[in-house]
């Protein structure tokens, strides 16, 4: 069995060593829930990577959005290049769920655009979980939505060995039943083709295809082939092919499901008639009978997911089968930014149920549509073996459920959490102006946090009227303009940035030495303990970082945030004294802010074009091979540009330029 092997050019330092040891001890002791409470910039991802390498268990990492998941996926890929690091997020580029708005009598049909490469990566994740244990899956909340049964996916796989007697006709029928499409002209992911005694299968979860060569009815050779160059990558003695989709059914599943759907339809029609909902009953009868006819003839119908419970043989109310069911029972879960991710996981079920209930009440769907849903919070928790929550500001759930809370407070740079002052609101604007001018004289920047957009805009106008170069950021500012504003702040073109919630920027601003929080004692989301600690962390990149809270009274949230910051600062100062460390402001080039924002947008694009770029690197040693590859890449680039996927087109363009430079260097 292959083990996790961590590759890193640096070793754990500071609090990382103790945090790794504590988490590993907890996992070995059987602790079900633990929390890693680490300040921003303390290297929490590297700590998690070390824990994975020492515990040696299949791992699921959940983040709260695709962008962060893509960043984590890339980091873990770098730490574990020899192991299976997989990416499991929603495969929809665009998704409009089916819904009904009673107030407007408006029915909205489901509309979606599926991303083929993300779909391949989802299948690759389940394939790896079936075949090996050294697996890390980085996912979003998509992992709590329904998938096909792992038993069906495993039981329906096809196994082929060299010297095996093989009926090609039978193999073709099996592949079609596994949702593979025959296409003898173009071989792509999820397809197969037959040429005489040779059958080529492109598994839906791989980036290369298999060629099975037969001598009459006997298998003589199995090879893995590169799809672009045609080069033989490896020869095998045996081969296992899994289904091309997660939702695959055994032969008797559809007839059995249709009987159950008819029974539920009859019961629901009686109920609607008794409630004098005749229009709803007629609508439901027409729609469901059409779906049944399609299921009987084609084995499929539009919106088949609404019949997932009857098809899978689940009882009403039973939890759906999800990605978590594909993991072995001893897997470990890491929840990144748990103070955001856990509430998001818990909210998915209720939001889905409200939408489905309208469809059921007004005769668009049978009650079984409710069972096509994400996991409830309690169901999700019941599937967990061991979990580690990761956050700088753990929520109530993490704090109450964790066997231990492991702190990681020391930054490798020696930087401390900022000093905090509380001042009365009387004369607050004049005080802010003086502090901003003092910062500007030292070539430092300032942030001012307000509660409303109007106040942010008015304050910006006021400061500009005083000659203080100021800009504002809020939800109406587009991404590109936001990047330009943040860049101008770092470059000194702007002295002050005013905003409402600057937490979501996710960008380090080492020049910021002063943060003013207006109305700091107002109770609400923007001034909760968690939000205040996150805001305070914005000044933790500068050695002279200071935060001033303007309030006429100290709220509980303020008190907790101040006490927590003071506690951290005391620990950090003691560590620095003991080790002779002098905190120094982080030095970053101004371009870093643009690069990082562009990296966020490019992460998803890299995932899309990764197979194509790897193919371009595989066999381009000759001028002819490079010329052929450039032509293929240029075609893909134009397709991406036509579909407005500009980040992907740019990555392909860069690869074309790289290949052309190789020819120039070789004098071709």
Curated annotation (Swiss-Prot):
It comes from the Bacteria. CDD domains: DEXHc_UvrB, SF2_C_UvrB. One of its GO terms (cellular component) is cytoplasm. The keyword Hydrolase applies. The UvrABC repair system catalyzes the recognition and processing of DNA lesions. A damage recognition complex composed of 2 UvrA and 2 UvrB subunits scans DNA for abnormalities. Upon binding of the UvrA(2)B(2) complex to a putative damaged site, the DNA wraps around one UvrB monomer. DNA wrap is dependent on ATP binding by UvrB and probably causes local melting of the DNA helix, facilitating insertion of UvrB beta-hairpin between the DNA strands. Then UvrB probes one DNA strand for the presence of a lesion. The beta-hairpin motif is involved in DNA binding. This is UvrABC system protein B. The lineage of its organism: Bacteria, Pseudomonadati, Spirochaetota, Spirochaetia, Spirochaetales. The gene is uvrB.
């Amino acid at each position: 069995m292959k083990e996790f092997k961590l590759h890193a050019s640096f070793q754990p330092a500071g609090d990382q060593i103790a945090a790794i040891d504590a988490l590993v001890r907890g996992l070995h002791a059987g602790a079900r829930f633990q929390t890693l409470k680490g300040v921003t910039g303390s290297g929490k991802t590297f700590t998690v990577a070390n824990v994975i390498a020492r515990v040696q268990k299949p791992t699921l990492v959940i983040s709260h959005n695709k962008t962060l998941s893509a960043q984590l996926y890339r980091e873990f890929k770098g730490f574990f290049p020899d192991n299976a690091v997989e990416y499991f997020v929603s495969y929809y580029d665009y998704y409009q769920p089916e819904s009904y708005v009673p107030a407007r009598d408006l029915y909205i049909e489901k509309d979606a655009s599926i991303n083929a490469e993300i779909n391949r990566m989802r299948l690759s994740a389940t394939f790896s979980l079936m075949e090996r244990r050294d697996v890390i899956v980085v996912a979003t909340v998509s992992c709590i939505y329904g998938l096909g049964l792992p038993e069906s996916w495993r039981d329906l796989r096809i196994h082929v060995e060299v010297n095996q007697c093989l009926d090609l006709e039978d193999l073709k029928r099996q592949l079609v039943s596994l949702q593979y499409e025959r296409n003898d002209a173009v071989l792509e992911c999820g397809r197969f083709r037959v040429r005489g005694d040779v059958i080529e299968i492109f598994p839906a979860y791989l980036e290369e295809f298999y060629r099975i060569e037969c001598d009459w009815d006997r298998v003589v050779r199995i090879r893995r082939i590169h799809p672009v160059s045609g080069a033989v990558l490896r020869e095998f003695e045996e081969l296992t092919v899994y289904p091309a989709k997660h939702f695959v059914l055994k032969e008797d599943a559809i007839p059995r499901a249709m009987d159950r759907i008819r029974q539920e339809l009859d019961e629901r029609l009686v109920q609607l008639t008794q409630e004098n909902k005749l229009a709803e009953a007629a609508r439901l009868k027409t729609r469901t009978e059409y779906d049944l006819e399609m299921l009987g003839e084609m084995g499929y119908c539009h919106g088949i997911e609404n019949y997932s419970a009857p098809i899978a043989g689940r009882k009403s109310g039973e939890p759906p089968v999800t990605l978590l069911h594909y993991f072995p029972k001893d897997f470990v879960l890491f929840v990144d930014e748990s103070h955001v991710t856990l509430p998001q996981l818990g909210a998915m079920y209720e939001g889905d149920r409200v939408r489905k209930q309208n469809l059921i009440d007004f005769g668009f769907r049978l009650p079984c549509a409710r069972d096509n849903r994400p996991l409830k919070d309690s169901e999700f928790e019941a599937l967990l073996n061991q979990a580690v929550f990761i956050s700088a500001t753990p929520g109530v759930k993490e704090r109450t459920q964790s066997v231990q809370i492991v702190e990681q407070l020391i930054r490798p740079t020696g930087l401390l959490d900022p000093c905090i002052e509380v001042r009365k609101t009387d004369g607050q604007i004049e005080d802010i102006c003086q502090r901003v001018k003092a910062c500007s004289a030292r070539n430092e920047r300032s942030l001012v946090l307000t509660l409303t957009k109007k106040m942010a805009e008015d304050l910006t106008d006021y400061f500009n009227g005083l000659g203080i170069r100021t800009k504002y950021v809020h939800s109406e500012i587009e991404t590109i303009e936001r990047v330009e504003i943040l860049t101008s702040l770092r470059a000194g073109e702007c002295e002050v940035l005013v905003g409402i919630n600057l937490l979501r920027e996710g960008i380090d601003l080492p020049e910021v030495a002063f943060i003013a929080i207006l109305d700091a004692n107002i109770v609400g989301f923007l001034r909760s303990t968690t939000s205040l600690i996150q805001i305070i962390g914005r000044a933790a990149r500068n050695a002279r970082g200071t935060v001033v809270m303007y309030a006429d009274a100290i709220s509980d949230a303020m008190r907790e945030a101040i006490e927590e910051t003071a506690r951290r600062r005391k620990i950090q100062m003691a560590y620095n004294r003991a080790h002779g460390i002098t905190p120094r402001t982080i030095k970053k080039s101004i371009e870093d802010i643009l690069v990082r924002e562009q990296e966020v947008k490019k992460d998803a694009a890299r995932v899309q074009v990764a197979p194509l770029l790897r193919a371009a690197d595989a066999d381009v040693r000759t001028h002819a091979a490079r010329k052929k590859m450039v032509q293929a890449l240029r075609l893909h680039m134009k397709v991406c540009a036509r579909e407005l996927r500009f980040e992907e087109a740019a990555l392909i363009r860069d690869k074309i330029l790289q290949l052309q430079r190789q020819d120039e260097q070789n004098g071709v």
